[in-house]
Amino acid sequence: MKTAHEVRPGNVIMLDGNPWVVLKTETSRSGRNAAVVKLKLKNVLLDSTTETSFKGEDKLDVIVLDRLDCTYSYFADPMYVFMDEEFNQYDVEAENLGDAAAYITDGMEDVCQVTFYEEKAISVELPIIVTREVTYTEPSARGDTSGKVMKPATIAGGSTLSVADFVKTGDMIEIDTRTNEFKKRV
């Protein structure tokens, strides 16, 4: 148990029987009144966000979620199956993947972190940088070289993002999975 004052972003707290990740904390103190802590929270199971306030001395139940390094194995509609080093398989529902689903492809060797709550896989966190092949992009426009020229490209897995003008179909590129931005050609 921690007081609301001691809770930091990244902590997972239990409220009304649901686990919530603390995204942001803001403490305000005014004159004679007790400190008030405002928390921005994200529900681990439902992927919804909310803001709530607590008195600084309110006790909150902080929990620790299990994380395990796994690799993607296969897709069994509607579940994505991941495997750890000991060949244990874990099913993650497609809706729990969120934006990560765009980067999951057959044969990928990236190590992902699977998060568990009560022994159930609830989310997958990809590495920050992934390398994917450009499956389609328009040819470069000649003479358009002023500034940072970007064009749309489709990568393996089907998602579309903006890439530099010099990238061609078949090139391997690095992508930042947090921002969905092109980093460089490999």
From Swiss-Prot:
Keywords: Cytoplasm, Elongation factor, Protein biosynthesis. It holds the Pfam family Elong-fact-P_C. The keyword DNA damage does not apply. The keyword Protein biosynthesis applies. GO terms for biological process: peptide biosynthetic process. It comes from the Bacteria. It is found in: Cytoplasm. InterPro entries: Elong-fact-P_C, NA-bd_OB-fold, Rib_uL2_dom2, Transl_elong_fac_P/YeiP, Transl_elong_KOW-like, Transl_elong_P/YeiP_cen, Transl_elongation_fac_P, Translation_prot_SH3-like_sf. Pathway: Protein biosynthesis; polypeptide chain elongation. GO terms for molecular function: translation elongation factor activity. One of its GO terms (cellular component) is cytoplasm. Its main location: cytoplasm. Involved in peptide bond synthesis. Stimulates efficient translation and peptide-bond synthesis on native or reconstituted 70S ribosomes in vitro. Probably functions indirectly by altering the affinity of the ribosome for aminoacyl-tRNA, thus increasing their reactivity as acceptors for peptidyl transferase. Belongs to the elongation factor P family. This is Elongation factor P. It comes from Shewanella piezotolerans (strain WP3 / JCM 13877).
